[in-house]
Design a protein with these regions (language model features):
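Non-heme Fe(II) oxygenase catalytic core, chiefly the N-lobe of the double-stranded beta-helix
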Residues: 1-58, 63, 71-72
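Catalytic core of Fe(II)/2-oxoglutarate
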Residues: 40, 48, 56-117
Length: 117
């Protein structure tokens, strides 16, 4: 499955700019800013979250990489995203070890902003 995935430069993750609105927090992190490793981006697997593929199909193939309660780092997920994306994070459900567990969580592809080029 990984061999068929699109390649994406690692710095594309950093090209997404942060946004805040309403009760949702929208940023370019897979999960919490309270990640135990500074700069690490990850997502906590949970039965109630979904990742939308770039064509908005469901579920995203990256879900196959996620066992429940596992962590997925950016290098695992990056090949599945061909462009910048935004993560919309709901309220934290609970605290586990050094990271927060969020649900629901949706990764929604968005075009790169001209000012970021």
């Amino acid at each position: 499955m990984m061999a068929e995935a699109l390649e994406m430069p690692k710095d594309s993750f950093d090209s997404c700019h942060e946004r805040h609105f309403s009760e949702l927090r929208c940023n370019n992190y897979f999960g919490s800013k309270d990640s135990p490793v500074e700069g690490q981006r990850w997502i906590s697997a949970h039965k109630d979250f979904s990742i939308l593929a770039p064509d908005h199909s469901y579920p995203h193939p990256a879900l196959a990489l996620a066992g429940r309660d596992d962590q997925i780092d950016e290098e695992d997920l990056a090949p599945y995203f061909s462009d910048c994306f935004t993560v919309v994070i709901g309220q934290p459900m609970q605290k586990r070890s050094n990271y927060r567990w969020f649900a629901p969580l949706h990764c929604v592809p968005v075009p790169k902003s001209p000012e970021l080029n």
